[in-house]
Amino acid sequence: RCRVIAVDSRLAPETRFPSAHDDALAAWAWVQEKAGAVAGIDPARMAVAGDSAGGNLAAYLCQEMVRARGPKPAFQLLLYPLLQFADIRTKKMSPQESGFFISASLFEFFKGHYLADPTRSMDRRMSPLFSPIEDLRGLPPAHIIVCGWDPLHDEGLAYAAKLRSLGVHTTEREYSTMEHGFLNLTHISSTARLAARDAGIITGKALGAL
């Protein structure tokens, strides 16, 4: 068993970049300071997790802690994460463009609502896949889940390969028949339930809880 702290970050279009990224850092700082007293949590045994855009925030948070030499999470769980907004065309060229739930063209829509300045898409906060190598070395261990029917499929695998090449302990699991967001379907999908269970076991082992 573990305690879970769910963070509500500000959303676009009411607030734009980098509000959600700032919120992720603020939440991490608060948890580091308060978790022990409030919830009896060991700050040295905390993981971060996020799906889709939340996976972007989790990946960025880990990189920022490396860059700033701050307290790093012990583990990162990235669920079909959004890891680059630099070139939406790479999503469109992928066979996974025809995903049932979400498409690359929809990411163009998201990008326009979050980024007031489209040239910021190469900012390391928006595209952690392309962050400098010095921000990637020393990252906490990672487990990355990707889906077969998802325009984010390729960048998830690319990030896993990149982290491994830099000595970061990284595993990935591909659910080839599933689509983006499938972990929200545990009430109707046995595959989603199995994936959620496996992700929990992997995280628990990484934190020394299993």
Positions of predicted regions on the chain:
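Alpha/beta-hydrolase superfamily serine-hydrolase fold, recognizing
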Residues: 1-210
